[in-house]
Amino acid sequence: MAPILFLQSCLSDDDYDDDYLAICPIDQPNALVTVKPNADNTGFIMQLNDSTTLWPVNMRQSPFGTKEVRALVNYRQATPSDIEKGSATSGMPCVFVNWIDSILTKPVVEGMYSAEENLQIYGDDPLEIVDDWTTVAEDGYLTLRFRTRWGGKAEHRVNLVHRTDVNTPYYFTLYHDAQGDTEGQTGDALVAFKLADWMMAPSDQDYATLTLEWKSYSGTKTAQFKFRQNKGNVSSTSEGH
């Protein structure tokens, strides 16, 4: 897993026409989406958040095949000319994709071992969770931007394990195995974890709380995320300590 260079997210230009998306440098991502292709990848949509789905008028197929993935994207609102040249669908905002790049997307691991065994299996190397717009829980995924040291000598591995040995609902630990590659420059990377279907099942409450634990360079830390169960989505509200 290679580190990713991150740039600041763009800001709106108050003088820009509201009928089109606010100005953003084309080399910067302006959204984090879930790419959802149909069964034979003859079309796909991009889930922007809990309630907004986007239709890419200038792309017929997902560049990632039939696999559902999280991705960084730079897009703008489609113009009438874009729609005329491409395709449109009723009831869905149409956008023009400038570029899109997938991030590592993995399932959650169901815990079957003790805390000590987990460390041996999944690794015990430190990392930091970066609190920015890409660290978010939404659309059935927990997406994390993390920071660690990269020496370029080995592929780092990260896993999110559901801790069934902890008496707290929806308790997860993020494990990092640097495979001995613990010296080098500090860099960031993104990873997204697909929350299990049982977590998304409808319940009496709209939201539940997910607790995330990880080993940082200064000791064990935790953060909490509220996720929406009854719509299969997750809210972006989070808090850490």
Regions found by a protein language model. Give the residues of each.
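C-terminal motif of bacterial Sec signal peptides marking the signal peptidase cleavage site
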Residues: F6-S9
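Bacterial signal peptide processing site
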Residues: L11-D14
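Cys/His-rich zinc-coordinating "finger/knuckle" motifs
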Residues: D17
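First exposed extracellular module after export/assembly in secreted or surface-exposed proteins
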Residues: A22-H241
